[in-house]
């Protein structure tokens, strides 16, 4: 897991990590804006086969907002203008807490123009830089939790746990409007969790750079840590070999108590992770995504690092 610093794109962080870890393949599981910092899961080598498992998971952010001002980008990197009079009083703690509760649950959110979403093959931010606004479809999001951490005048910090695809920049502006200040923009943003991964598990680029090649490998998470919610089974040598060769196997599954069409993490009898299979019949398992064991370095080229 990578703790991406502010001021660098996720893709730049990805490329640095890929170089330092001498990985042939690499990909991240969800972009962080350049201004944002925090958890960026990066998958390396064979782990890229399983990166999609993190794309739809919930995420948690700590966001700092400035009320009464808006930005064309939704954050401190854009053109900022005041939208409320200087004679307006700041909110109190109870007022903000009450408004935050109204955002809980399901709602629709229109993605911002300054985003990487594509329209006709072109990222929205490119239209925005050309002064063009295009129609965007609203997307359903879920705010699971939102709490006020600090409040000082028109500046506040909140913690938000939300569904994948939620734009915290848009949420910040909507909170500012709901409080009666015409909007708000982000002055800072940190992602502190992605699914079951926490920022406390992450390393930063300076640490990665300072370590020896051997110690860098020790910072990586094992590939199967991406698949914590998927049940596992143990195979004997013959079963493992046949699945790795792309063949289906018959196996007595009665002791596992799992329904048909269940995805399965596959391990050999030495507890080596082999990949994902699926139970397509009460006693039939087929391979779905198997790893090439000779390409896995210390089993950890599943390392997760969050960057754009």
Curated annotation (Swiss-Prot):
The keyword Zinc does not apply. Its EC number is 5.4.99.25. GO terms for molecular function: RNA binding; tRNA pseudouridine(55) synthase activity. It catalyses: uridine(55) in tRNA = pseudouridine(55) in tRNA. GO terms for biological process: mRNA pseudouridine synthesis; tRNA pseudouridine synthesis. The keyword Isomerase applies. CDD domains: PseudoU_synth_EcTruB (cd02573), PUA_TruB_bacterial (cd21152). Belongs to the pseudouridine synthase TruB family. Type 1 subfamily. Responsible for synthesis of pseudouridine from uracil-55 in the psi GC loop of transfer RNAs. This is tRNA pseudouridine synthase B.
């Amino acid at each position: 897991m990578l703790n991406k610093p502010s001021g660098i794109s996720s893709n730049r962080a990805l490329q640095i990590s890929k170089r330092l870890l001498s990985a042939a393949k690499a990909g991240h599981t969800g972009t962080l804006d350049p201004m944002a910092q925090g958890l960026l899961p990066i998958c390396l080598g064979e782990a890229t086969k399983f990166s999609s498992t993190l794309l739809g998971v919930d995420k948690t952010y700590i966001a700092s907002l400035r009320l009464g001002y808006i930005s064309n980008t939704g954050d401190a990197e854009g053109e900022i203008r005041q939208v409320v009079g200087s004679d307006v009083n700041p909110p109190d703690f109870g007022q903000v807490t009450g408004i935050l509760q109204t955002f809980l649950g399901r709602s629709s959110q229109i993605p911002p123009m300054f985003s990487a979403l594509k329209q006709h093959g072109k990222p929205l931010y490119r239209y925005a830089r050309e002064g063009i606004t295009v129609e965007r479809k609203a997307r359903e999001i879920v705010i699971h939790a939102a709490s006020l951490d600090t409040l000082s005048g028109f500046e506040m910090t909140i913690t938000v746990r939300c569904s994948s695809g939620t734009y915290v920049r848009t949420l910040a502006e909507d909170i500012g409007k709901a409080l009666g200040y015409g909007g708000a923009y982000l002055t800072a943003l940190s992602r502190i969790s992605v699914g079951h991964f926490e920022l406390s598990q992450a390393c930063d680029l300076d640490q990665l750079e300072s370590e020896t090649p051997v110690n860098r490998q020790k910072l990586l998470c094992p590939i199967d840590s991406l698949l914590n919610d998927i049940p596992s089974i143990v195979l004997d040598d013959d079963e493992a070999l046949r699945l790795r060769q792309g063949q289906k196997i018959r196996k007595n599954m009665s002791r596992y108590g799992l329904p048909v069409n269940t995805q399965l993490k596959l391990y050999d009898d030495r507890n080596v992770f082999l990949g994902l299979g699926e139970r397509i019949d009460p006693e039939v398992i087929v391979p779905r995504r198997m790893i090439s064991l000779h390409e896995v370095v210390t089993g950890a080229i599943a390392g997760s690092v969050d960057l754009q």
